[in-house]
A protein has these predicted regions:
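N-terminal Rossmann NAD(P)H-binding glycine-rich loop of SDR-like oxidoreductase domains
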Residues: 9, 17
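Conserved Rossmann-fold SDR core element
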Residues: 56, 136, 146-160, 198-205
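Conserved NAD(P)H cofactor-binding loop of Rossmann-fold oxidoreductase domains
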Residues: 63-69, 207-208
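Substrate-binding pocket helix/loop in short-chain dehydrogenase/reductase
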Residues: 71-73, 80-82, 170
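Alpha-helical segment proximal to the catalytic Tyr-Lys
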Residues: 101, 143-148
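C-terminal substrate-recognition "lid" of short-chain dehydrogenase/reductases
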Residues: 182-205, 210
Length: 219
């Protein structure tokens, strides 16, 4: 079994790659050193490099994302907007497009790492929230476009990486009393990779956060 993980050197992506390897997958963990997938040619090259190294492709996990710093919507710049959509939405589209033929051949799976910020409005993370919402729609678009040979699913984690002074607050927003971990996301990836009758849907991995009051959403 052969997997490409974009954002594979980040905290969440590396946990996904490590878990897949532990389960016997051959993994190509793509990071910035392999190219900026916000660039179309770089995105295609990353896929080709992975296919050449692995001998094919059974799973694409798109975990690449931006590192947006929260700010009021009045202060968001064009550069902020472009950076948010670059690796997340644009990169997700063109990496999946490039991988599609290989995944059709293997009957493979695409898993988009979305975010609960793409399912609810977070004003202080406007570009990131909008980019993740776009990625959520791409999950559905590709599920229809690549069926029946390829399944496409999404995972929307709640807060996973937070500042130490915010951990208690974020944990209180979860019904389970803690924030998520990269391993929680990796568990969901393994489930969806083997869930043969699941496609076109997003699995929310947030400890029940979305069931809490919308008043907890920061402004």
């Amino acid at each position: 079994m052969r997997a490409l993980v974009t954002g594979g050197t980040g905290r969440v992506g590396s946990a996904i790659a490590a878990r897949l390897e532990k389960e016997g997958w051959d993994v190509f963990a793509a990071g910035k050193v392999h190219g900026d997938i916000a660039d179309v040619e770089a995105a295609r090259a990353v896929v080709q490099t992975a296919v050449d190294e692995l001998g094919g492709l059974d799973l694409l996990v798109h975990a690449a994302s931006d590192g947006f710093v929260p700010k009021p919507v009045e202060e968001v710049t064009e550069e902020d907007w472009d950076a948010a959509f670059g690796a997340t939405a644009k990169g997700g589209f063109f990496v999946t497009q490039a991988a599609a033929a290989h995944l059709r051949e293997s009957g493979g799976v695409v898993i988009m790492i979305e975010d609960v910020m793409g399912l609810e409005p977070w004003p202080s993370f406007a570009p990131h929230s909008a980019a993740k919402a776009a990625l959520s729609m791409l999950t559905k678009v590709f599920a229809r476009a690549l069926a029946p040979e390829v399944r496409v699913c999404g995972i929307a984690p709640g807060p996973v990486v937070v500042e130490p002074n915010q951990e208690e607050r974020r944990a209180a927003e979860s019904l389970l009393g803690r924030i998520g971990t990269p391993d929680d996301v990796a568990d969901a990836v393994l489930y969806l990779a083997g869930a043969a009758f699941v496609t076109g849907t997003t699995l929310v991995v947030d400890g029940g956060r979305l069931l809490q009051s919308a008043r907890s959403i920061p402004t």
